[in-house]
C-alpha cells in the first residue's frame, strides 16, 4: 500500500512507452512484458496493434481510477525528486494520463470512431482534466543538466546538442519544415529563428556566428547531406558549442544546449487535440480558440515576444478555414500547426502525418526502399529487425509501405 500510487504511475509510463513502440512497428510482442516476463530469444509471438491499443486504454483507465492524489508519491518532490518527468507531482501525472488517452483516442479515430469517441470523452471529462499549462509538459531532462534543473549534474548529453556537435553537423532543417515556417502566416514563424541557424560555415557556427542567408531546408531523400559542408546550404539546429561546458546556461538565443529538456507531450499538443476533438463533436468549445491556444502555448514555451506572437497569429493565411464549415480544411490547419509545434519530437510528427496525411509534404527526392514504399508515397512503419525474418510468428506482409 505504501507504493500504491507509484505502481499506477509506472503503468501510465508503460502505456506511454508502448504507444511509441506500436506506432513505430505495428504489431509488437506485448504479452510477455504485460506478464512481467522476458520474451524468448527466438520465435516470439506478436500482439495485434488493435489488442495493444486495448491494453493501453486499460492501463490508463486503471491508473486514473485507482490513483489516490491525497497520498502523493514517495519519490521526493521538487527539483531533487527521483521523478525525472514531473518532480513527484501526482496531479501532473494524472493530467498527463488523460492527455495521453486523448492522443491515443484520436489515433484510432479513422479505424474505430466509436471507441475513439468513447475514450476521448473519458479523457476530456475526467475529474483530473488535461494538461493546464506548459508546466505540465511531459519531458525528460538530460543527466548532464544540473540538479536544480532536474538533471544529475553530470553524465551523458543524450540530446540534439550532442548530435549537431558530436556527430558531424548533419542535423538540418527539412524542406517541409521550411515551407511551414514561411507559408503558414504572412510573417516568418518566430519559432524558426529560435530553433535554427541560417546556412553558414560550420566553423562560424562554432563561434555563434551566422550568415545573412535565408533559412533553407533539405528535401526528403536528399543523400548529399554529408558532414560539416551541409551547414553551408541548409539551416542546422540552433545551438552554441561555446556554452556546452556551462550546463547551467539555458540561453534562448541558442536553444539546444546540453542541459535542454526533451518534450514528449506538450500543453500545446493538448490544445490542438481539443481543437480536433471539438471538430469531431466530442466536446464543446470553439475549434478556432483551441487552435489559437495551441499556437500561443507553443510560442510561450519558447518565450517568444508577445508582439511577434500576435503578428504571426494575425497573419495566419488559412485561419478562417478552422472556423468554417469544411471540416477537412479545418483538420488540415489544426494538424499542420500541431506538426510544427511537435518539433523536435519526430516520432510523434510522423505518427500524426500517417494518421491524417497532413501536413501536405513535398514528394520524396529519392526512394531507397527496395519497393517497400510505392513511388510518391511515404514510409508507414519501421521494419522489424532482420533477426525476425525467420520467425514464423512474424506478421506477414508488414513492409514499410503498409499501415
Give the location of each predicted region.
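Structured, solvent-exposed acidic/aromatic patches
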Residues: 1-301, 324-329
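C-terminal functional modules
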Residues: 296-403
Amino acid at each position: 500500500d505504501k507504493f500504491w500510487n507509484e505502481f499506477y504511475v509506472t503503468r501510465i509510463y508503460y502505456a506511454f512507452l508502448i504507444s511509441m513502440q506500436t506506432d513505430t512497428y505495428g504489431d509488437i510482442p506485448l504479452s510477455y512484458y504485460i506478464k512481467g516476463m522476458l520474451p524468448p530469444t527466438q520465435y516470439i509471438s506478436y500482439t495485434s496493434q488493435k489488442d495493444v491499443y486495448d491494453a493501453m486504454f486499460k492501463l490508463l483507465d486503471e491508473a486514473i481510477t485507482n490513483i489516490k492524489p491525497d497520498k502523493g508519491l514517495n519519490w521526493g518532490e521538487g527539483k531533487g525528486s527521483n521523478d525525472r518527468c514531473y518532480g513527484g507531482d501526482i496531479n501532473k501525472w494524472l493530467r498527463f494520463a488523460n492527455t495521453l488517452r486523448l492522443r491515443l483516442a484520436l489515433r484510432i479515430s479513422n479505424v474505430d470512431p466509436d471507441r475513439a469517441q468513447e475514450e476521448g470523452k473519458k479523457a476530456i471529462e475526467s475529474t483530473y482534466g488535461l494538461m493546464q499549462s506548459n508546466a505540465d509538459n511531459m519531458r525528460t531532462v538530460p543527466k548532464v543538466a544540473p540538479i536544480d534543473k532536474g538533471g544529475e549534474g553530470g553524465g551523458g548529453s543524450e540530446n540534439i546538442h550532442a548530435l549537431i556537435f558530436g556527430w558531424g553537423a548533419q542535423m538540418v532543417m527539412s524542406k517541409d519544415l521550411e515551407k511551414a515556417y514561411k507559408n503558414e502566416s504572412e510573417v516568418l514563424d518566430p519559432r524558426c529563428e529560435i530553433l535554427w541557424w541560417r546556412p553558414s560555415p560550420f566553423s562560424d557556427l562554432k563561434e555563434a556566428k551566422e550568415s545573412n542567408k535565408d533559412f533553407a531546408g533539405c528535401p526528403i531523400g536528399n543523400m548529399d547531406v554529408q558532414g560539416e559542408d551541409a551547414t553551408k546550404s541548409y539551416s542546422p539546429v540552433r545551438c552554441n558549442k561555446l556554452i556546452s561546458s556551462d550546463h547551467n546556461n539555458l540561453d534562448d538565443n541558442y536553444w539546444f544546449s546540453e542541459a535542454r529538456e526533451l518534450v514528449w507531450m506538450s500543453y500545446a499538443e493538448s490544445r490542438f487535440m481539443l481543437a480536433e476533438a471539438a471538430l469531431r463533436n466530442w466536446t464543446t468549445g470553439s475549434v478556432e480558440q483551441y487552435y489559437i491556444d495551441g499556437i500561443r502555448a507553443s510560442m510561450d514555451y519558447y518565450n517568444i515576444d508577445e508582439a511577434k506572437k500576435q503578428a504571426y497569429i494575425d497573419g495566419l493565411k488559412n485561419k478562417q478555414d478552422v472556423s468554417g464549415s469544411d471540416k477537412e480544411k479545418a483538420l488540415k490547419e489544426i494538424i499542420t500547426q500541431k506538426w510544427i509545434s511537435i518539433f523536435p519530437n519526430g516520432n510523434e510528427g510522423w505518427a500524426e502525418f500517417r494518421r491524417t496525411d497532413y501536413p501536405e509534404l513535398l514528394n520524396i527526392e529519392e526512394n531507397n526502399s527496395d519497393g517497400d514504399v510505392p513511388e510518391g508515397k511515404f514510409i508507414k512503419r519501421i521494419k522489424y529487425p532482420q533477426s525476425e525474418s525467420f520467425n514464423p510468428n512474424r506478421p506477414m506482409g508488414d513492409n514499410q509501405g503498409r499501415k
